[in-house]
Amino acid sequence: ETLHCAHYQALNPVVSEGMVQMAMGTPAALYNGGLLQTHLFYFDPHRQRPGLPEHVAALVDRASNDSVRVHLVNTNPVEAVPVVLQAGAFGEHRFGEALFDANGLSQQVAVDGRHLRVDLGPAVSLVIELSLTRYAHRPSYGRPPQ
């Protein structure tokens, strides 16, 4: 029996491709069990787990070979929320510089590493343009330092 590459999508009622593409700036894994190749990956430092923290939304609206732009929003009107951005699903990429833009105010920061911690204030919307060197590090399942 020959199966189409989208065969497993018909069996699974949860389709996450759209969310993966919007939040991480990449198409979803090509087949069931394939490795995810992303520009960005997120960690929740409070819960010490992969993924976006509660009340945080992310949208990648531009991605290229050497940069990625992401919009981060903290929907919590009362509390600040930290989020850690990782360069690549396995930390295989390296961030060079980050250009932060919040309400027209810009700030450039040198990162030069796999991880960037961002503390989002209450009800804050932020745009970050990150320069990216692809495949600068050996891929790893390691987590960001606490």
Where are these regions (language model features)?
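Beta-strand secondary-structure signal
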Residues: 69-71, 82-84, 117, 127-129
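Surface-exposed beta-strand/loop patches in extracellular or lumenal glycoproteins
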Residues: 76-91
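C-terminal, active-site-flanking charged/polar segments
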Residues: 90-93, 123
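Solvent-exposed beta-strand/loop surfaces of large extracellular or lumenal domains
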Residues: 95-116
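C-terminal beta-strand-rich structural cap/linker in extracellular carbohydrate-active enzymes
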Residues: 112-146
